[in-house]
Amino acid sequence: MILTVTMNPSIDISYPLDELKIDTVNRVVDVTKTAGGKGLNVTRVLSEFGDSVLATGLVGGKLGEFLVEHIDNQVKKDFFSIQGETRNCIAILHGDNQTEVLEKGPEVLEQEGQDFLEHFKKLLESVEVVAISGSLPAGLPVDYYASLVELANQAGKPVVLDCSGAALQAVLESPHKPTVIKPNNEELSQLLGREVSEDLDELKEVLQEPLFAGIEWIIVSLGANGTFAKHGDTFYKVDIPRIQVVNPVGSGDSTVAGISSGLLHKESDAELLIKANVLGMLNTQEKMTGHVNMANYQALYDQLIVKEV
């Protein structure tokens, strides 16, 4: 079973409009509300793929109750309740544009943060792989993910970590390393304080920087150009076919689902990388974020090429 962790989930509300009129009333007929957050996108894709998944994280108030109720019934759930209210994230779809209004979310009390660590520690007993995704809510220290990784390491569970900014920096500087990180070029540039290109020789050098020491897998998305990856001392390039993209949002989360599944099933390097890329690509072909059509899985799988470089 895979444990997904979403520390700052949301109710994602979609308002489709023909036109967004400013300083007047806009009436919405077709409102969509879903359980949102990067970790919950991972959860959905794992469930659709057919893997057993347990979802956890922080929820609060009536919106938190709504969120848990609207996670697929096939998914096991064991969230931790806090005093603050789970946030709303609103997307206004008008014409070809998308305007987002994102609430900050609850401020987590120090004791709640400590109590969740104990909650997380207990959940580790029943899972084989951990996937941690997204931002930290206000109130938690910047090195909180390092604490989660430490507990998972102590329990012997591999961790796939998908976060960015100060939270990722804190983990990289910690002695407690995740099994997998999944930065893109922009995030690599942020971490190193210099521009990083998609040149394979440069990426090889970058991924051997001391900052990344001790991390077993580093998987870098190159968008339409595929993926570059380092596993131990071996480097890989994944070539992908051109596809029709409908909605790219959530493709990174779907990739995390594939990585986590590959670790769960102890697949070869090539199998893990292909699965991760295929699930990410399938997500881009759907309107709904964090959703894959498994009927198209094998045909796409057969088109991907993994090369050692």
Swiss-Prot record:
Any Pfam family: PfkB
Keyword ATP-binding applies: yes
GO molecular function, one term: ATP binding
Keyword annotations: ATP-binding, Kinase, Lactose metabolism, Nucleotide-binding, Transferase
SUPFAM superfamilies registered for this protein in UniProt: Ribokinase-like
Annotated pathway: Carbohydrate metabolism; D-tagatose 6-phosphate degradation; D-glyceraldehyde 3-phosphate and glycerone phosphate from D-tagatose 6-phosphate: step 1/2
Record GO biological process: D-tagatose 6-phosphate catabolic process; lactose catabolic process via tagatose-6-phosphate
Assigned EC number: 2.7.1.144
GO annotations of cellular component type: cytosol
Gene3D superfamilies: 3.40.1190.20
Reactions mediated catalytically: D-tagatofuranose 6-phosphate + ATP = D-tagatofuranose 1,6-bisphosphate + ADP + H(+)
Classification via InterPro entries: Carboh/pur_kinase_PfkB_CS, LacC, PfkB_dom, Ribokinase-like, Tagatose/fructose_Pkinase
Record carries keyword Membrane: no
Superkingdom of source: Bacteria
Coiled-coil ranges (or none): none
Annotated family: Belongs to the carbohydrate kinase PfkB family. LacC subfamily.
PANTHER family noted in UniProt: 1-PHOSPHOFRUCTOKINASE, 1-PHOSPHOFRUCTOKINASE-RELATED
Protein's recorded name: Tagatose-6-phosphate kinase
Source taxonomy: Bacteria, Bacillati, Bacillota, Bacilli, Lactobacillales
Designated gene of the protein: lacC
